[in-house]
């Protein structure tokens, strides 16, 4: 626990495995790695090829997280590349070990399918996609696998898993350490 950690109420009990994961986190080192990692991969014309405003958005989100903020809002107009921007941001957060497991939450199945397609098609590093670098679970997969780095789900499916759990499909409070909500 760092001196800047603010207390917060948890919505459930942390499992022993979740507690171990929390104790193994080295947020200071991850923040340092994140700050010192250049944005060259995100600018690469053979990769994401993000524009200046997209990289500025990622930098602002990273600064907020490093400064201890719990929530960040990125607002971008339709057609400005929100999904590609988020892809770059998620990649940097996972690569730096700042976050271990990401929930990408959408309000419609079509948005989830679109995001999943982008994650599986857009090249990031050494002509590899996010899906080929990290394990991604799509909309149709409900079980939370500890090796999964990114899980795409609709709000409705998540509410169903929380309110009407079937076997082990109910997420624990430590299953995701970053939640990205698209629209």
Please annotate each region the language model reported.
Residues 1-101, 106, 110, 114-126, ...:
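ATP-dependent helicase/translocase motor core
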Residues 109, 130-141, 155-160:
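Conserved helicase motor
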Residues 182-183:
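Walker B catalytic acidic pair
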């Amino acid at each position: 626990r760092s001196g800047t950690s603010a207390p917060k109420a948890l919505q459930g009990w942390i499992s022993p495995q979740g507690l171990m994961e929390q104790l193994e986190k080295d947020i200071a080192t991850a923040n340092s790695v994140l700050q010192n990692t250049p944005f060259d991969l995100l600018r690469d014309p053979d990769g994401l090829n993000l524009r200046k405003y997209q990289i500025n958005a990622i930098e602002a989100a990273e600064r907020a997280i490093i400064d201890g903020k719990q929530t960040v809002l990125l607002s971008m107009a339709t057609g400005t590349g929100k999904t590609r921007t988020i892809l770059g941001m998620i990649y940097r957060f996972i690569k730096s070990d700042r976050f271990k497991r990401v929930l990408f939450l959408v309000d419609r199945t079509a948005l989830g399918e679109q995001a999943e397609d982008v994650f599986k098609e857009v090249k990031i590093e050494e002509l590899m996609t996010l899906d080929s670098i990290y394990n991604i679970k799509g909309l149709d997969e409900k079980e939370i696998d500890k090796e999964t780095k990114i899980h795409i789900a609709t709000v409705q499916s998540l509410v169903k898993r929380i309110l009407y759990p079937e076997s082990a499909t109910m997420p624990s409070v430590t299953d995701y350490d970053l939640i990205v909500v698209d629209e």
